[in-house]
Amino acid sequence: MQVSYKWLKELVPNLRATSAELEQKMSTSGIEVEGVTSPMEGLSKLVVGEILSSEDIPDTHLHITQVNVGAEESLQIVCGAPNVRVGMKVIVALVGARIADNYKIKKGKIRGVESLGMLCALDEIGIDEKINPMKHEDGIFEMPADAKVGDSIFSYLDMDDEIIELSITPNRADALSMHGAAWEVGAIYGLPVQLEKKDLVEASESAASKIAVKVETDKVPTYKIRLIEGVKIAKSPQWLQNRLMNAGVKPINNVVDVTNYVLMAFGQPLHSFDFSKFGSDEILVRQAKAGEKMTTLDHVERELDDSDIVVTANGLPVALGGVMGGADSEITDETTSVALEAALFDGTSIRKTSQKFALRSEASSRFEKGINEGTVREALDFAAAMIVELAGGKVLSGVVESNDYQPILPKVSITLSRVNSALGTDLSLETVEKIFVQLGFGVEVEGEKFTCEIPSRRWDIHIEADLVEEVARIYGYDNLPSTLPSSQNAGELTQMQKFRRTVRTGLESSGLNEVIGYSLVTPEKATEFVGQLETTTLMMPMTEDRQTLRANMIPGLLDIVNYNQNRKNADVAIYEIGNIFLPNPDDIRPIEVPNLAFAISGNVVDKSYNGQAVPVDFYYAKGIVENLLEAYKEVEFIPSNNQAAMHPGRTAVIKINGRVAGFVGQIHPATAKKYDIAETYVAGLDMQVMLEELPAQTIFTDIPKVQAVHRDIALLIDAEVTHAQIVSVIKSSRIKTLSQVELFDIYQGKNLPAGKKSMAYSLTFQPVENTMTDEEITAAVNKITKNLVEKLDIEIR
């Protein structure tokens, strides 16, 4: 936001602080000032001149001019501009002058003719092309007729102004206007604000007799139109052009410039239509139809869908609501009747449309961040009066509108003790009340309780904490005392904090590196690996990519895998421990659940001269989980073919003591392609379940004093039977001495029946006191094989 210091002083007449002092004060009061610049910076010796005579140089486009610059003698200056004429007031760069790009003007000869200066166009004195009302080929700039010859040009073009560049955060969009900035400065210094006023005179003829307004979407709370007839389109007066250029806006014509001026002053976007081009006496505001097309002011045809808001006349779109007008109804030099629009458009809808079409405008950015809902009518009336003032014509009586929307002003209460407790201060009742009055709040004091009625221009204030922040800002952050927090309790880690440290150690011992991802992601990524789920979305996100609280952490890890692999780091092993956010049926605030997730990709062992590379696979990822869950009594890996975004044949749901705790597996190839990454394996675990199911203590057992016994069994089974099923049946045989079951061979193919596979297991029996006899070993193995045959229809080979 570019704030003109001259304009600001008009709105806060008693302001005595310099721009440098203002920069420091605003920065320490909550609104960052990026810097203060002046349009005249780096320029010198630029004066008003008047062309006394002009003579063409034969066979060229050049002219020999004699220019009065207020000196005893006129200056001879050679100029090639096509619009040079006698009597014209111009910008003269004298010999020795500095113009744009630090170029120094020297005495010279052009086509053998001596030239003692330069007649300048606006771009030649540093006016950026984006805000320059003239094209370079149009020629030199003509100064106002009342400009005094010999005077410096800077005051006539307001180039002696100082521009304060504000960096406005989304929560302080109220400062995206001159009025908002004035209220802020007035509050900081305790000065009254004097906003601009204009008296609107209406004609006797009613606007409602010529036009009607209808709104068929709930995304437009109010839509207002004023009709102005008999206008004459022309250039705006120089003061208005100057003010717009200093605000970073390009002057167009008197009508369009008024709408832009009001946008900068009030923060209220307006749009002006050529009413004669409507071909209808009704404006209909609705959602666009899929496939509907319109050509916007930038003369680009755009195909719309039902998420876009359109303003239509005669059944056709004449504006992309809140974003840009249509080319078919734009103001031209022939326009005589103007339909002036002021409305409230849904910010989320505007943001989506703006991003979809890459149309970022001053209007759309303000609708996205929020505008003062209480001054829509005031801004419309001000603009109508100003158009008549500059372009003539008459304002038809009455505002034609969809409904007379008025915002409800919230009331927020706080006590003096709460303010002082939060800030560590000892402020008096009078001091805090004065601060609220300076902010323009309506204040009622009852005992030590303040009840503040918040004006519509401060839509960011809703709760007690907001009032505390306002007091801190205006009182001055630098004036707050430095205090240390006091506590009666000794510090101690919680059970979850201790558990996180244990888990972190386990993951890092498996070769994984910790990363920290964003809690805010896109709505799509928030639920990508967990299916359909209600999510929590910010009302005013900083960016579209950071608007929804994540319901899982894996998309963030995949983004990091992509980042590394794009930089030739193919082997990635990372994990994150953090919170995910799940819907809370009893509260608008989500439930925070501690989770861990990891992602691995590439090789476990790289290829070398004496061995092949060993890539990561499902079993490697599963092994990391098994190591992590080694202390748990019962851990199951159940095959899953319907886990969102995961490979249906290489994914397992993880259960701890019968409770679902997470999943592990390969991401679906389509998901990997979307993230532009190689084959990647991931896991996600609920740390709350892990902590709750963690054994209370580890029971010590003596090291066995007798030798373990090993027996191998080979099984012919259906191909669909899993290793987990087999291990579960073996353990269900309840052989007390069975200490380990290990799969050491799998075969499927030649010499085996179709649909069958062979799996070989090593069984380890560990007696505690006495060595097992052959009969005991045989009985144990037979019990296991019998159980396998009965429950899984297995053939013992």
Curated annotation (Swiss-Prot):
Record's Pfam families?
Answer: B3_4 (PF03483), B5 (PF03484), FDX-ACB (PF03147), tRNA_bind (PF01588), tRNA_synthFbeta (PF17759)
Q: Which CDD domains match?
A: PheRS_beta_core, tRNA_bind_bactPheRS
Amino acids binding Mg(2+)? D460, D466, E469, E470
- GO terms under biological process: phenylalanyl-tRNA aminoacylation
Has the keyword RNA-binding been applied to this entry?
A: yes
Enzymatic reactions: tRNA(Phe) + L-phenylalanine + ATP = L-phenylalanyl-tRNA(Phe) + AMP + diphosphate + H(+)
> Any idea where the B5 domain is?
407-482
For this protein, what does the record note about how its cofactor is bound?
Binds 2 magnesium ions per tetramer.
Q: Where in the cell is it found?
A: Cytoplasm
Where the record annotates domain tRNA-binding, the positions are 40-154
Protein EC = 6.1.1.20
Q: What is this protein called?
A: Phenylalanine--tRNA ligase beta subunit
Assembly and interaction partners: Tetramer of two alpha and two beta subunits.
Molecular function terms from GO: ATP binding; catalytic activity, acting on a protein; magnesium ion binding; phenylalanine-tRNA ligase activity; transferase activity; tRNA binding
What PANTHER family does this protein's entry cite?
Answer: PHENYLALANINE--TRNA LIGASE BETA SUBUNIT, PHENYLALANYL-TRNA SYNTHETASE BETA CHAIN AND LEUCINE-RICH REPEAT-CONTAINING PROTEIN 47
* Top-level division of the source organism's lineage: Bacteria
Q: Which residues cross the membrane?
A: none
Q: What is its main location?
A: cytoplasm
Q: What are its GO cellular component terms? A: phenylalanine-tRNA ligase complex
Q: Which gene encodes it?
A: pheT
Q: Provide this UniProt record's keywords sorted from A to Z.
A: Aminoacyl-tRNA synthetase, ATP-binding, Cytoplasm, Ligase, Magnesium, Metal-binding, Nucleotide-binding, Protein biosynthesis, RNA-binding, tRNA-binding
Q: Which organism is it from?
A: Lactococcus lactis subsp. lactis (strain IL1403) (Streptococcus lactis)
Lineage, uppermost ranks: Bacteria, Bacillati, Bacillota, Bacilli, Lactobacillales
FDX-ACB domain residues are 704-797
Cofactor(s) listed in the protein's UniProt record: Mg(2+)
So what family is this one in? Belongs to the phenylalanyl-tRNA synthetase beta subunit family. Type 1 subfamily.
